[in-house]
Amino acid sequence: MSITTKTFQFGNDTVTLETGRIARQATGAVLCTIGDAQVLATVVGAKSAKAGQDFFPLSVHYQERAYAVGKIPGGFLKREGRPSEKETLTSRLIDRPIRPLFPKGFMNEVQVVCTVMSTNTNLDADIAAMLATSAALTISGIPFNGPIGAARVGFNDESGYVLNPSYSDLDGSLLDMVVAGTKDAVLMVESEAQELTEDEMLGAVLYAHKEMQAAISAITEFAAECAKPRWDWEAEAANVSLADALQSGYAAQIEEAYGISEKMARYAQLGVVRDAAVAALVTEEGEFTEADVTGAFSKLEKRIVRRRVIDGKPRIDGRDNKTVRPINVEVGLLSKTHGSALFTRGETQAIATCTLGTSRDSQMTDGLTGESKDSFMLHYNFPPYSVGECGRMGGVGRREIGHGRLARRGVQAVLPSEDEFPYTIRVVSEITESNGSSSMASVCGASLSMMDAGVPLKAPVAGIAMGLIKEDDGFAVLTDILGDEDHLGDMDFKVAGTAEGITALQMDIKIEGINEEIMDIALSQALEARTHILREMAKVIGYARPEVSPNAPSMATIKIDPEKIRDVIGKGGATIRSITEQTGASIDLDDDGTVRIYAADKASSDAALLKIHEITAEAEVDKLYKGKVVRLAEFGAFVNILPGKDGLVHISQIAEERIRAVTDFLSEGQEVIVKVLDVDARGRIKLSMKDVTEEEKAAYTE
């Protein structure tokens, strides 16, 4: 096999695709290089589908190797383990735009493996992985209606849209968006933003689609040089006689069942109709198997529901295309949590809780970009009971990780800075009922629970899921889609944001792309729905509570001179250990002089704060202090006025009259009130007792 390479310019980056040198036994393999990022994508496709298989078994695995940045993995085994959250999210990012481009009816197993071989810590390798996957599929011969292109977009007021920004570029960006699509249409969007307008978000999608054309053209040219012959595969012809039998015998009953608005009752009735069809059409000698009938029945269901929407009839639950389901909001329903909310929208329901912790509770991660500390976590749980099913319980699945990340993107932009609110925040969304858009219910619940916990959000956030039914003779954009509309429709378009703008946008297309008009309509309807939901939420709670929950840890933060850190710690940690033992508080010190104090109650944190103030305080001229005489000398007395700080009361400053001996007036251990006269350049403190008037002594309080 000969080696083929293709080099092209993609914005400011030079991209090289190579095949024929590495992983030659895979069905398709491409090494993509963008700057320092080198990602190997391999594709293997089974030549035939497993007997009786009724789904497309596509799996995508993105894996980061520590050697890619010259590191040895941590831990006892010193090798990579289970996929990180970043690897899981990127695997989903690659999967979503390629899945709709395999032809309907293709059931052969396909596995994509993307391995980051080399990169630098300022670059995300996901775009290289997506381009490598696109190229590997396009040259593999597997039926695939690509290629796709992919691009990351940043945005700021000075530069406008920025193509494929690095991590450092994204630090000042108002947008982080990844877009994938074909030559003609957009297939996938994943983004988080700082309250951008609908026009700015749509502009970013269109900008990315325009810029990715260079990559799509290059992959097409690359495939022309080295692609394997396309597999001789054709979809199995539809069984017309079975379709006709179902249409004539059961279409009316299916349509009647879809008039039932309550989900479980509707499913039960559809089950009755399906069982009747199977019983009537499947016989031992018959030409139809049970799998044939149930498969054709599902296709008829889909066709009926979609046709109803296109024809302008009411949706499954009786709504029109723009109406949001009834909303119910409760906060503070769980007594011992720091913040809680119950958000219900139709038959979708989430209980969100907010827990406040210390900086020691923050999430530590160690990836290719190095170690990082995350003080905000949002975890999404989707138990099987939420859809009335029995199911596997245990570890977190890819879907839960993806939905949790989307909900996190939705609220990230409104979080206070650590300086404003130095707590670690963990939000957990428990989906207790699901019938569409549970991730957007999690956004609403997260916003509500944090406000209930006293987290000073910049603004409340709400989310909504939009859907699409598109046929040759028209299309309809649906607001607040049900689970069935998601399953039977062509688009899942989720938007989260505040009253001012969008904070997260996710789009997945199940057909071969949509155009600008559809996206514009979807964004417009989403704005209307989001505004409505925010109004409903504001009826219950519109701002953060003025105080954090009494169940939350008490926290105080002060800034001290970094030179004073050693004084707070003390010899061998004696001072800080003493403060902790006396007050019960925990203390964290940063190199920049930031001191964080955590305690179970305010009294403990205040006591620790006072002690640190005393240790780090500087003597102020003309200020009164109550001190203790620590040593006597012929020329005066040394008085301790602050922890670790002694000053001298000269014999002439002890009393108005002339005294013969210091011991006539003072003794060691005696408490006295003194005034600071001066602090010289070497830090020596001059004190006076005689300059303190009787009135000042009487008025002085510690």
Curated annotation (Swiss-Prot):
It holds the Pfam family S1. The keyword Transferase applies. Residues 553-612 form the KH domain. One of its GO terms (molecular function) is magnesium ion binding. Keywords: Cytoplasm, Magnesium, Metal-binding, Nucleotidyltransferase, RNA-binding, Transferase. Disulfide bonds: none annotated. Its main location: cytoplasm. CDD domains: KH-I_PNPase (cd02393), RNase_PH_PNPase_1 (cd11363), RNase_PH_PNPase_2 (cd11364), S1_PNPase (cd04472). It comes from the Bacteria. Its EC number is 2.7.7.8. Residues 622-690 form the S1 motif domain. SMART domains: KH, S1. GO terms for biological process: mRNA catabolic process; RNA processing. Mg(2+) binds at residues 486, 492. Its cofactor is Mg(2+). It catalyses: RNA(n+1) + phosphate = RNA(n) + a ribonucleoside 5'-diphosphate. It is found in: Cytoplasm. GO terms for cellular component: cytosol. Component of the RNA degradosome, which is a multiprotein complex involved in RNA processing and mRNA degradation. Belongs to the polyribonucleotide nucleotidyltransferase family. Involved in mRNA degradation. Catalyzes the phosphorolysis of single-stranded polyribonucleotides processively in the 3'- to 5'-direction. This is Polyribonucleotide nucleotidyltransferase. It comes from Marinomonas sp. (strain MWYL1).
